[in-house]
C-alpha cells in the first residue's frame, strides 16, 4: 500500500523545474536566421492558418520518394525534402545528406536521427506555440478549447447536412496506440489506463482544467488534457507522447532516462505530479479546510485506509486513517508468509472468482491484507490505557473507498539477498464487492472468518474491472502491456503502438500486475 504523498513545498517545485539537458545536435541548425526559417516551416507546412496555406500544404507536402502524403510525413530542417517516417525515406535522406534533424508535419515535433528520438528544446517550443496560436487566430479559433460558435454559413451547411456521427457499441474512438520512445512501455500502459478512466475522461474532455502555473508548458495536467484530446480526436495513427515523457522526467527525476522503469512507480509519480499541478482546479478552500484537497485526482483515486492497533492487555484501540492511491498486495511465493486457502474455497465461487484447488484469488489477497496481524514482542507499543509498552495486534480496513480502486500485485521482490519476479497466477473478477473489507463490516468478521454480505442490494461498494496492466519477462528484462475496456464487454490489448481486440478470457487469464476497478454506482457529495 502506497500512501498519498503530502503536497511538496514550493522550493522543491523550483528545483524540479530545471529541465534535463537537451539534444546536443541542435547547434548545427541554430545558425544565422534559424528562427525565421523555422517559423516559415511551421506557417507553411505544419499549422497552416489560412485556407491558401492549407491548400498549398495539401499539394506540396508529399514524400519526395514515393509521392504519398501519409505515413507520418517529415520535412528536413536543412533543405527542401519531404519523406515518409514509416517507410524510412526521411531516414535514408538524413543518412545520405547527413541532415540529422527533421520536423513532423502533423504535430510539429522535432526528430533527431543521431539521438534516434524526438527532442525537446525550449526555444523551438516557444516558436511552435506562438505559430500555433497565430494559426488558431487566423482560423477564428482563438484558444484551443474555446466554445465553438457556428457562423451563418456554417449553420446553413448544418441544415443541409443533418447527419451526425453516433457513438455506437462498435465505435473505436478513444483507441490509439502510443509510440515507444525507448523502454517507455511502462509509461504507455499507464497512459492507456488513465485515458480510459471514465471520470477522468469526462473531466478533461469537458475542459475543466484551469491552469494557474506561471509556465503552462511545464504543467502535466495541461499535457494530459492535450493527450485526451488526441486520444478522442478520431485519429488512428499512433500518438508520440514525447512531451509527456519530458514533463515526467522534469517533475519526477528518479524516472528520467531510458532505463527500464516500474509501471507502478510511474503511476504513483504521475498521480503525485498531477495532484500538485491541479491547484487551480481545487475548490477545497470552500470547505474551510486547508488540509482538504478536492482536485480531480483526489476525487477519483484517493481512499481512506483505517488502521486499528489493539492492546492485548486492556484491549484498547488506537485508530488512524491515512489516504491512499493504491493498495499493494502480497502474493504467495514471496518471502512474506502467506496463508493457505480457506477449506471452503475449493470448487466455490466467491466475489465472481472461481476458486479452484490451489488457486489464489484477488479476494484471498484482500483477506490477507485486512486480517489482524500480531505485531510481536519486538514491536511493542505504548498503550495509552495501560501507560506502558504492550504487545498488540494491527488490522487494516477500508474507511473510505475511492471511485477508482487500483490493486498492485507485488510481483517484484527486492531484498538484500533476493531479487526476483513472482509469477504466481492470481484470479481476479470482472466485478468486485469490497463490502467485506470495509471498516463498517469489521464487526461481522470474527477471528479471520469472512462471509459474503447478506445484503446483496447494497451496491455502494461494487466495482467493475476496466483496465489491467501486465508484465512479461524477468525482473532484469521485460515488457509491459495493458488490457483496457472500451465498452461494457469490449476489451482491447494495448502493446505500445499496436492495438488488438481481446476476449474477456484473454483478460482474466493474464498474469495481472496492476488491476483498475471503477465504482459501479457513484454517490453525490
Swiss-Prot record:
Sites where the protein binds Zn(2+) 3: 76, 79, 93, 99
Reaction catalysed by this enzyme: Thiol-dependent hydrolysis of ester, thioester, amide, peptide and isopeptide bonds formed by the C-terminal Gly of ubiquitin (a 76-residue protein attached to proteins as an intracellular targeting signal)
In-chain residues carrying the UniProt-annotated modification N6-acetyllysine: 129
Phenotype upon loss of function: Deletion mutant mice leads to early embryonic lethality.
Positions of transmembrane segments: none
Protein's UniProt keywords contain Secreted: no
GO cellular component, one term: SAGA complex
Residues noted as binding Zn(2+) 2 in the record, renumbered to the chain: 63, 66, 84, 89
SUPFAM superfamilies for the chain: Cysteine proteinases, RING/U-box
Tissue expression as described in the entry: Highly expressed in brain and weakly in other organs.
Entry comment on modification after translation: Phosphorylated in G2/M phase, but not in G1 phase by CDK1.
Record flagged with keyword Signal: no
Superkingdom of this protein's organism: Eukaryota
Principal location class: nucleus
Gene Ontology molecular function, alphabetical: cysteine-type deubiquitinase activity; enzyme binding; histone H2A deubiquitinase activity; histone H2B deubiquitinase activity; histone H4 acetyltransferase activity; transcription coactivator activity; zinc ion binding
A GO BP annotation: positive regulation of DNA-templated transcription
Protein residues bound to Zn(2+) 1: 23, 25, 112, 115
Localisation per UniProt entry: Nucleus; Cytoplasm
Entry keywords, A to Z: Acetylation, Activator, Cell cycle, Chromatin regulator, Cytoplasm, Hydrolase, Metal-binding, Nucleus, Phosphoprotein, Protease, Thiol protease, Transcription, Transcription regulation, Ubl conjugation, Ubl conjugation pathway, Zinc, Zinc-finger
Function field: Deubiquitinase that plays a role in several cellular processes including transcriptional regulation, cell cycle progression or innate immunity. As part of the transcription regulatory histone acetylation (HAT) complex SAGA, catalyzes the deubiquitination of both histones H2A and H2B, thereby acting as a transcriptional coactivator. Recruited to specific gene promoters by activators such as MYC, where it is required for transcription. Facilitates cell-cycle progression by stabilizing CCNB1 and antagonizing its proteasome-mediated degradation in a cell cycle-specific manner.
Subunit structure: Component of some SAGA transcription coactivator-HAT complexes, at least composed of ATXN7, ATXN7L3, ENY2, GCN5L2, SUPT3H, TAF10, TRRAP and USP22. Within the SAGA complex, ATXN7L3, ENY2 and USP22 form a subcomplex required for histone deubiquitination. Interacts directly with ATXN7L3; leading to its recruitment to the SAGA complex. Interacts with ATXN7L3 and weakly with ATXN7L3B. Interacts with MED1.
Name of the protein this chain belongs to: Ubiquitin carboxyl-terminal hydrolase 22
Amino acid at each position: 500500500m502506497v500512501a498519498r504523498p503530502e503536497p511538496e513545498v514550493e522550493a522543491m517545485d523550483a528545483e524540479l523545474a530545471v529541465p534535463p539537458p537537451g539534444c546536443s545536435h541542435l547547434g548545427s541548425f541554430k545558425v544565422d536566421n534559424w528562427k525565421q526559417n523555422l517559423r516559415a516551416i511551421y506557417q507553411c507546412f505544419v499549422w497552416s492558418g489560412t485556407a491558401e496555406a492549407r491548400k498549398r500544404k495539401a499539394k506540396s507536402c508529399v514524400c519526395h520518394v514515393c509521392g504519398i502524403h501519409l505515413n507520418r510525413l517529415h520535412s528536413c530542417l536543412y533543405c527542401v525534402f519531404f519523406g515518409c517516417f514509416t517507410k524510412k525515406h526521411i531516414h535514408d535522406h538524413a543518412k545520405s545528406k547527413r541532415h540529422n534533424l527533421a520536423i513532423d508535419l502533423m504535430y510539429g515535433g522535432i526528430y533527431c536521427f543521431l539521438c534516434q528520438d524526438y527532442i525537446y528544446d525550449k526555444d523551438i517550443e516557444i516558436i511552435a506555440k506562438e505559430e500555433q496560436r497565430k494559426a488558431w487566430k487566423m482560423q477564428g479559433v482563438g484558444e484551443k478549447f474555446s466554445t465553438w460558435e457556428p457562423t451563418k454559413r456554417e449553420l446553413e451547411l448544418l441544415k443541409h447536412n443533418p447527419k451526425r456521427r453516433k457513438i455506437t457499441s462498435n465505435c473505436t474512438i478513444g483507441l490509439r496506440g502510443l509510440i515507444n520512445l525507448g523502454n517507455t512501455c511502462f509509461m504507455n500502459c499507464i497512459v492507456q489506463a488513465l485515458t480510459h478512466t471514465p471520470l477522468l475522461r469526462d473531466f478533461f474532455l469537458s475542459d475543466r482544467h484551469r491552469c494557474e502555473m506561471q509556465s503552462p508548458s511545464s504543467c502535466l495536467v495541461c499535457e494530459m488534457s492535450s493527450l485526451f484530446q488526441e486520444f478522442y480526436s478520431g485519429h488512428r495513427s499512433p500518438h508520440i507522447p514525447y512531451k509527456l515523457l519530458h514533463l515526467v522526467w522534469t517533475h519526477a527525476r528518479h524516472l528520467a532516462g531510458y532505463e527500464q522503469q516500474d509501471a507502478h512507480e510511474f503511476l504513483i509519480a504521475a498521480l503525485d505530479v498531477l495532484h500538485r499541478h491541479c491547484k487551480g482546479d481545487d475548490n477545497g478552500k470552500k470547505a474551510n479546510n486547508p488540509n482538504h484537497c478536492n482536485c480531480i485526482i483526489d476525487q477519483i483515486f484517493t481512499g481512506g485506509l483505517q488502521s486499528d492497533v489493539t492492546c492485548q492487555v486492556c484491549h484498547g484501540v488506537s485508530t488512524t486513517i491515512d489516504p491512499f492511491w493504491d493498495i499493494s498486495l502480497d502474493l504467495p511465493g514471496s518471502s512474506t508468509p502467506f496463508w493457505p486457502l480457506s477449506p471452503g474455497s475449493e470448487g466455490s465461487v466467491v466475489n465472481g472468482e472461481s476458486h479452484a484447488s490451489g488457486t489464489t484469488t484477488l479476494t484471498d489477497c484482500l483477506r490477507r491484507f485486512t486480517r489482524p496481524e500480531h505485531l510481536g514482542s519486538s514491536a511493542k507499543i505504548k498503550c495509552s490505557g495501560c501507560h506502558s509498552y504492550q504487545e498488540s495486534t494491527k488490522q487494516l480496513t477500508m474507511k473510505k473507498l475511492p471511485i477508482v480502486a487500483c490493486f498492485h500485485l507485488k510481483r517484484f521482490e527486492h531484498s538484500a539477498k533476493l531479487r526476483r519476479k513472482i509469477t504466481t497466477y492470481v484470479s481476479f473478477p470482472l466485478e468486485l464487492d469490497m463490502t467485506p473489507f470495509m471498516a463498517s463490516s469489521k464487526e461481522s468478521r470474527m477471528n479471520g472468518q469472512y462471509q459474503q454480505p447478506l445484503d446483496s442490494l447494497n451496491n455502494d461498494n461494487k466495482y467493475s474491472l476496466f483496465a489491467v496492466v501486465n508484465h512479461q519477462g524477468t525482473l532484469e528484462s521485460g515488457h509491459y502491456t495493458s488490457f483496457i475496456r472500451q465498452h461494457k464487454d469490449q476489451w482491447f490489448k494495448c502493446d505500445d503502438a499496436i492495438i488488438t481486440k481481446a476476449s474477456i478470457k484473454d483478460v482474466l487469464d493474464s498474469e495481472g500486475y496492476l488491476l483498475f476497478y471503477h465504482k459501479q454506482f457513484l454517490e453525490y457529495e
